[in-house]
Structures are given as C-alpha cells and as structure tokens.
Amino acid sequence: MQNNNDILKAQSPAALAEEYIVKSIWQDVFPSGSNLPSERDLADKIGVTRTTLREVLQRLARDGWLTIQHGKPTKVNNIWDAAGPNIIETLIALDMQSAPLIIDNMLSLRSKMSESYIYEAVKNSPQKSTALFAELEQLQNTAQDYTEFDYQLFRQFTVVANKPFYRLIFNSLKGVYQRIGLLFFKEKKHRELTKQFYLEMQQICLEGNADAVVDCIRKHNLRSSTYWKAILERLPQNLSD
C-alpha cells in the first residue's frame, strides 16, 4: 500500500480504495492506457474486500477514470479525454498547483455561459428573471449567504432560459463553486461589489433590457478580476477539505 502521507483522508474502506486508485492513476503508478492489477491482487494490496473494490471500480468507471472490460482487465483512461467536470474537486485535491488554473477556467466558463443564457432568460421571460431576485432585499451580509444566493441565481437563470445542459454543468460544479465562493465572499468589499452587480441585473430584468445583459456581466467581471487574481494566488492548501 502507498505511504500514509500519499493517501488522502479516507473514512471508509470504499473511500480508501477510491483514493488509492485515483492517486495511483494521477501519479502514473497506473498510467493512462494500462490495465489495473487483477481484482484479487488490488483488493489485497489496498486491504479491502473484492466486493467493496468492485463497487469502487464501477463508480470510477462512471466518472471516466476507468473502462471496465468484461472478461478482460480494467483499463485506465486518460481523464482529460474521458472524464467530466464532476471530477474537478478531486483534481484540486490531488494537485493544488493546478488548482488556480482549473478554478480560473471554471470562472471563465461560467462567465461565457452566463452571457448567453441570462440574455435568453431576460429576453424571453423578463418577469421570471426578475423573480429570481425576490430574496435579494433579505440577503444576509455573510459569505455563506452570498455564496448560496450567487449559486442559485446563476443556476436558476438556466431554468428560466430553458438551458438544461447548462443547469447540469452547474450541478456538477456545485461543490467547488461553493468552496471558492466562500473564499471570495468572506471579504466585505467583494460582497459589496457583487451586491451592486445584483442590483444592476435586477434593474435590467425589470426593464426587460436583454441587450444590456452582456455588458453588465462583462463590467462586473472586469471589476472583480483583480480580487479573483489575488485569491487564486493564495489559495489555501486545505481548499478541498
């Protein structure tokens, strides 16, 4: 089994097996394109039952880490070709050096997507779009409340815009979205800047002025970019805990 320092904090045999396999893939102990050891050998090496290991392998296969070949050894995938955004939290836990780039990519994706679907939402359903800000007046001035409001606002705009694919992307990113949201919104000046953005977007929705959406989003991103740059330069090592 790997050195204890190399194993993430596992709370159960299944979690231990999953973390062992994922870290072994990431560190090229089980390189992309290779086959895993037999279930018996791997279960013995990790110290779990074959039943537990089999359940873990199936879960990792669903996430894109592995390909289970019936009657043949389980194959290790190239995660950059086979996996989806739902493994982002795992990647951040495995490699904090890559975390700023991954998070920056995620923020960029959110910005580009939101320009499109919020425009559609306001254009087609200004009243429903306005209703998304119903709780804004009661928004508590805490990092937790701002993080939750921000996530729900951007996610619910995908519902109003009838963009189910974008909604699924938000679902898959929820964990890391909330973690970095708490980092951003713990600063009062960040909350104040974002509150102003919410008020501007609320007014745009009230007026049904869809053509103003993209400019509003881009201006907010520009204003907050310096704050985000500072956050990404000093990400805490326990971000994934």
From Swiss-Prot:
Subcellular location: Cytoplasm
Lipid metabolism recorded as keyword: yes
GO biological process: fatty acid metabolic process; regulation of fatty acid metabolic process
Domain HTH gntR-type per the UniProt entry, residue ranges: 11-79
A GO CC term assigned to this protein in UniProt: cytoplasm
Presence of the UniProt keyword DNA-binding in the record: yes
Pfam families the record matches: FadR_C (PF07840), GntR (PF00392)
DNA-binding region: 39-58
Gene Ontology molecular function: any one: DNA-binding transcription factor activity
UniProt keyword list: Activator, Cytoplasm, DNA-binding, Fatty acid metabolism, Lipid metabolism, Repressor, Transcription, Transcription regulation
Record field: transmembrane: none
Subunit composition and interactions: Homodimer.
Record function comment: Multifunctional regulator of fatty acid metabolism.
Name of the protein in question: Fatty acid metabolism regulator protein
Protein source organism: Haemophilus influenzae (strain 86-028NP)
Encoding gene per record: fadR
